[in-house]
Amino acid sequence: MPHVAVVGAGAFGGWIALHLLEGGAHVTLLDAWGPGNSRASSGGETRIMRATYGPDQPYTRLAARALRLWSKYERRWKRQFLHRTGVLWMVSSRDDSLERESLTRLGEAGIAFQKLSPGPMKKRWPQINFADVRWGILEPECGYLDARASCQAVVAALVAGGGSYRQVAVSADGLENAPFRGLTLSDGSRLKADYYVFACGAWLGKLFPETVGDLIRPTKQDIFFFGPPAGDSRFTDTHLPVWGDHGKRFLYGIPGSGRRGFKVADDTRGPAFEPTSGERVVTQATLKRVREYLAFRFPAMKDAPLIETRVCQYEQTADSHFVVDRHPQMDNVWLVGGGSGHGFKHGPALGEIVAELILRDGEPDRVWCLSRFPEARS
């Protein structure tokens, strides 16, 4: 079986490496700062698990497969990563086509859902102001994932199963030159393999400036955690689902989990961000906007103190679809990335797909190919 070097131990790279190992490959996984580190797109404590995506996309079925795989590995490792609080989509936008067209896709994929009118929502979650909400979707089997912990667990399982993990950086020198002659590492060594997978998130364009470059653009995303009133459990994951609010903007949140506070963020793509050296400090403008929203949608949280902030990045493509493709000049080099703010949940399923593509010499889904970009190098 082949030796595969995987660069990046996040939600994509870690799961790709583990599935390759389970498929019989010899695997070496590399990461510059370690799984779940604070610079990574997969860092932080939590990520949302949802399947509502609209029409004409592969992600609802991918999420359905991911749900099954998360459950499978939870049982195998005897650890919980998916917290099935439910996910509530609140539709306040005049254009509700995404949500309406999602209902058919959810049913086809076997995802449980409920279509809700304002009355039942108000009765079930009185802590939410549904004043302008027209209707909603509840995905009861979805919720949130433990992000950092699951990335670390995947790498631990890889090593326990006989795979190799090294915390080293990969030099960009020579990566675009065919034929591919291996990796130069930050410890001065070189690594040669039969196949190479680069699943290095916001750094993919830096390592492959000619092939990827600005096709994947890191954006700065501010995250806020607010403290609910003392003794008030209405804003914890025992009394409130994960939620998304589709209005003029799209905001989302995760109820206080692990006692870290009430997580709120604006999904609007932020400014360009340098993931290695960028200062991870939130802006007052974003905080003001989120506070105004919080006061309206969750009135009891109007004066809640800000108890924690975080800056992560999206690795954004122009169409928000992933990149899964061979390097156009080197058949044994795979490029995987472009999570675009919604990739984490899909890690187990995407890893399974990519591992099969490599081991069976398959062809990737055209929606993820580099050729979809007019400016892509051929």
What are these regions (language model features)?
Residues 293-378:
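C-terminal catalytic lobe of FAD-dependent flavoproteins
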Residues 72, 93-162, 166-167, 172-179, ...:
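Flavin (FAD/FMN) cofactor-binding and adjacent substrate-gating region
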